[in-house]
From Swiss-Prot:
This is 5'-nucleotidase SurE. The gene is surE. It is found in: Cytoplasm. Its EC number is 3.1.3.5. Its cofactor is a divalent metal cation.
Length: 261
């Protein structure tokens, strides 16, 4: 199995190193990842500027650090660096969970969807991090990836045997909280209640920090609900985001009447 690994936390992330350790025991690994933190960029790609690359080493594997996004990394890795597109893309292991429909903003999930959109199956895997500071700290020493590595290894073997062709969004609780359950569940509607903080710089110019408060009462049976209760949660994803066509048609009827005068 030929595996392309990327992430959105950047090439120096301990989660990326953990993913490399998991994957290289199962297949042939290629690593292409952003040079810097890219959380929140979703599936965006770099169209208006070149993507620079730097050759480095990650866990003994030759790797490329790129100036672009996780989706850029997938495109460059799959269609330029590798002789042929990979059998699978692994995005992660992300520092912090990626659950609910808010995954649309995740660079980790965005990379997996970019792979799927180009005919490559993918896994987006994220690790619950209880220390908020560790989510953006590439020197974090207190994140235990042992369970996530076990999950990823087992999934790779399962996918190889099952001929999986889609995207799996995988979220792993802190090992100390795992209740022994693995749940295949739908996405919650949202994970955060928006929290916008307005500030002023020393020159009186206004600026904002965008943040959010994690919802503590999500609907039962959703990924956020089950993760908060200590389960490993897995959600199959697709790039088809088509909504309710019948409901839209009711609205469009009024539009047709208005335009026909």
């Amino acid at each position: 199995m030929r595996i392309l690994i990327t992430n959105d936390d950047g090439i120096a992330s301990p989660g990326l190193r953990a993913a490399v350790r998991a994957c290289r025991s199962v297949g042939e690994v290629t690593v292409v990842a952003p040079a810097t933190q890219q959380s929140g960029v979703g599936r965006s790609i770099s169209l208006l500027e070149p993507v620079r690359v730097e050759e480095i080493e990650v866990e003994g594997v030759d790797a490329l650090a790129i100036s672009g996004t996780p989706a850029d990394a997938v495109l460059i890795g799959a269609f330029s660096i590798m002789d042929e597109p990979p059998d699978l893309v692994v995005s992660g292991i992300n520092l912090g969970e990626n659950v609910s429909a808010d995954v649309t903003t995740s660079g980790t999930v965005g990379a997996a969807l970019e792979a799927y959109g180009n005919g490559i199956p993918a896994i987006a895997i994220s690790q619950e991090v209880r220390d908020a500071r560790a989510r953006v700290d590439n020197n974090a020493k207190n994140v235990d990836f042992t369970l996530a590595i076990r999950v990823l290894k087992a999934l790779l073997e399962a996918i190889r045997g099952a001929n999986w062709e889609g995207v799996l969004n995988v979220n792993v609780p802190d090992p100390d909280r795992w209740n022994g359950e693995i749940k295949v569940v739908p996405l919650a509607f949202t994970m955060y209640r928006p929290r916008i903080e307005k500030r002023y710089d020393p020159r009186g110019r206004r600026y904002y920090w965008i943040d959010g408060e994690i919802i503590q009462d999500p609907p039962e049976g959703t990924d956020l609900y089950e993760l908060q209760r200590g389960s490993i949660v897995i959600t199959p994803l697709t790039t088809d985001v088509t909504g309710d066509l019948d409901a839209a048609e009711n609205v469009i009827k009024e539009l047709r009447r208005a335009l026909r005068g």
